[in-house]
């Protein structure tokens, strides 16, 4: 890459010409990563201010992005062709140097298609697999565009009434959770290093004072959660009138979490430029039709891209599903972790990072302490922990100090921990989409990973979706899962996810541009593909909707193994009640189930 020589030169010099000197990039030999540390020469000016927020941020090394040779569908009018590389995309030189510093050698498909569209000033809706590089796909063109436009220097700001400082960011990135906002903030800082741009993050769950101090120094790029941003705008600490770029990441998650009123208030009633003036980009792993229709209120003549099958899981993840009772989960988890530890000890490698998902906050804390008592250092992250506790838990997990993290769904989307080797669904989620996002914490950016799910009788509604996903990803499917998938389920649809607002049928993952008669677009695998000028909508259409019905008509109960017990709730009996699941046999555990349940951790 042409920027590589410039990077080497600037690293040796400990700074860049015109950048104020100061910090330096260094390579850590054990991990192959680079990190920035603020040197003694950082005393002020643009780089001095910027370096304060960047000190200690770790930059990922080579990410094996060439493995992303997956199909891409594009629909819309006058679609720019995909870029073969970062330089071909048209990024400015300062951003190219930062791309090289991060060790990115070639763009992923979502980056290859999104960057030319964004740099051309077009509105964009992008659907891509978890871990496919969505964050860089919008951060890179936004930073490049702001640098090319010049303007405010470090942190655009103005004085409002009563001499209070009001930040006037030129780019706004909305994210559903604190963790995702913090991650995007880190990425944006890496890509805007020594460009003169100032990046600020604002989210709830933590005192506002420090965030207000950051904003008073100005912000070119503001990354925020909707609730905290509304609060800051109403306090006259932020003005949205200068917004040139609006990005919504995990847009479906924000709407499902109930942020629609805040988002509409931000976009429509807080003095933000009209959609014909600003540029708007929406990124997510799923876009059901009703969310596409809602999002279209914020977009103008947009281009829709789908990278891979929306809602699918990457084939870099080896998936296993184990049939268990609730009482067997802890014993099987312990056995799984012990076998994993033995393999690591024999190979003298570092303990792999393992993410364990549970349903409740109470179970997260309980399981964490229980694992510690069994000799497995673990931490936990969930909504009841303070922001400081959550950040400390993530830091401890990322560094490997506690290589096991027990989490609720607060950590299931958007978080980028580069080296998660194993995701364990101790409790399965309620929808296939959430399952996909959970296991997407591993197998990221071209790296292989493993995912294990503990399936109980209460997870019957997920059987068909799991079967389809595992079959599509060419995984080994156990016979008992096929049997479960073939039985009708009378508890309502499991394929639309939670809180879906449309009735019946439709696409399971809805990765298709709902606009009719869209113009032609590009279609290809990974690197490019040919141009098709048809009128179709692009994207993929999944299967039909799931089963619907009355209340649950009973469930299986564990006596020995299997056996059907007709339960309360309307809906009638299961016509397949005679087909009990086949018996399973488990390895012997250091501690029996009875001992586990008697240990006081349940």
UniProtKB/Swiss-Prot annotation:
Domain annotation Helicase C-terminal: ranges: 328-485
UniProt catalytic activity: ATP + H2O = ADP + phosphate + H(+)
Amino-acid positions noted as binding ATP in the UniProt annotation, renumbered to this chain: 128-135
GO CC annotations, alphabetized: nucleus
Chain positions of motif Q motif: 84-112
Gene Ontology MF terms in the entry: ATP binding; ATP hydrolysis activity; mRNA binding; RNA helicase activity
InterPro entries (UniProt xref): DEAD/DEAH_box_helicase_dom, Ded1/Dbp1_DEADc, Helicase_ATP-bd, Helicase_C-like, P-loop_NTPase, RNA-helicase_DEAD-box_CS, RNA_helicase_DEAD_Q_motif
Residue interval(s) of motif DEAD box: 249-252
Disulfide topology: none
Region feature Disordered, mapped onto this chain: 9-31, 492-521, 552-602
Pfam families the record matches: DEAD, Helicase_C
Domain of life: Eukaryota
Compositionally biased residues, Gly residues: 15-24, 552-574
EC number: 3.6.4.13
Ranges of residues in domain Helicase ATP-binding: 115-305
UniProt record similarity statement: Belongs to the DEAD box helicase family. DDX3/DED1 subfamily.
Domain-related comment: The Q motif is unique to and characteristic of the DEAD box family of RNA helicases and controls ATP binding and hydrolysis.
Name assigned to this protein: DEAD-box ATP-dependent RNA helicase 52A
Species for this entry: Oryza sativa subsp. japonica (Rice)
């Amino acid at each position: 890459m042409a920027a590589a020589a410039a990077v080497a030169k600037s690293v040796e010099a400990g700074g860049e010409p015109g950048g104020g000197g100061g910090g330096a990039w260094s390579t850590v030999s054990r991990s192959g990563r680079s990190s920035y540390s603020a040197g003694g020469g950082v005393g002020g000016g643009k780089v001095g201010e910027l370096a304060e927020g960047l000190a200690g941020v770790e930059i990922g090394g080579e990410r094996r992005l060439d493995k992303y040779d997956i199909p891409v569908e594009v629909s819309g009018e006058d679609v720019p062709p995909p870029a073969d590389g970062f330089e071909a995309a048209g990024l400015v030189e300062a951003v190219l140097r930062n791309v090289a510093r991060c060790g990115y050698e070639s763009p992923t498909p979502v980056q290859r298609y999104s960057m030319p569209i964004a740099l051309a000033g077009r509105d964009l809706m992008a659907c891509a697999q978890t871990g496919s590089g969505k964050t860089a796909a919008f951060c890179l063109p936004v930073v490049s565009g702001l640098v090319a436009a010049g303007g405010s220097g470090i942190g655009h700001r103005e004085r409002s009434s009563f001499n209070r400082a009001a930040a006037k960011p030129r780019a706004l990135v909305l994210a559903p959770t604190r963790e995702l906002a913090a991650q995007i903030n880190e990425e944006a800082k890496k890509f805007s290093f020594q460009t003169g741009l100032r990046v600020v993050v604002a989210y709830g769950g933590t005192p506002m004072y420090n965030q207000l101090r950051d904003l008073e120094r100005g912000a070119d790029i503001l990354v925020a959660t909707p609730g905290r941003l509304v609060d800051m705008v109403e306090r006259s600490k932020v003005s949205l009138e200068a917004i040139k770029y609006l990005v919504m990441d995990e847009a479906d998650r924000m709407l499902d979490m109930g942020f629609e009123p805040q988002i509409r208030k931000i976009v429509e009633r807080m003095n933000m430029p009209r959609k014909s003036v600003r540029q708007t980009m929406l990124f997510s792993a799923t876009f059901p039709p009703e969310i596409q229709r809602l999002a279209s209120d914020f977009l103008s003549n947009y281009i829709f891209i789908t990278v891979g099958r929306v809602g699918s899981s990457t084939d870099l993840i080896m998936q296993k599903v184990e049939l268990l009772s609730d009482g067997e989960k802890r014993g099987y988890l312990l056995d799984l972790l012990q076998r994993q530890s033995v393999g690591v000890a024999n190979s003298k490698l570092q303990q792999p990072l393992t993410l364990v998902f549970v349903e409740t906050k109470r179970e997260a804390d309980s399981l964490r302490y229980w694992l510690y008592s069994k000799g497995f250092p673990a931490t936990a992250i969930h909504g009841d922990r303070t922001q400081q506790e959550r950040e400390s838990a993530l830091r401890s997990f990322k560094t490997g100090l506690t290589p096991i993290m027990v989490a609720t769904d607060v950590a299931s989307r958007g978080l980028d921990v580069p080296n998660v080797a194993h995701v364990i669904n101790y409790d399965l989620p309620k929808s296939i989409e959430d399952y996909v996002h959970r296991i997407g914490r591993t197998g990221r950016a071209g790296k292989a990973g493993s995912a294990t799910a503990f399936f109980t009788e209460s997870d019957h509604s997920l059987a068909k979706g799991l079967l389809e996903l595992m079959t599509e990803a060419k995984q080994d499917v156990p016979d008992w899962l096929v049997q479960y998938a073939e039985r009708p389920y009378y508890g309502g649809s499991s394929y639309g996810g939670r809180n879906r607002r449309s009735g019946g049928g439709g696409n399971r993952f809805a990765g298709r541009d709902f606009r009719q008669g869209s113009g032609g677009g590009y279609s290809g695998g990974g690197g490019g593909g040919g141009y098709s000028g048809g009128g179709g909508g692009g994207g993929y259409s999944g299967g039909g909707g799931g089963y619907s019905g009355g209340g649950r008509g009973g469930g299986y109960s564990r006596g020995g193994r299997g056996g059907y017990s007709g339960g309360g709730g309307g809906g009638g009996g299961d016509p397949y009640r005679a087909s009990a699941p086949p018996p399973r046999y488990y390895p012997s555990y250091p501690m029996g189930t009875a001992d586990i349940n008697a240990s006081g951790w349940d």
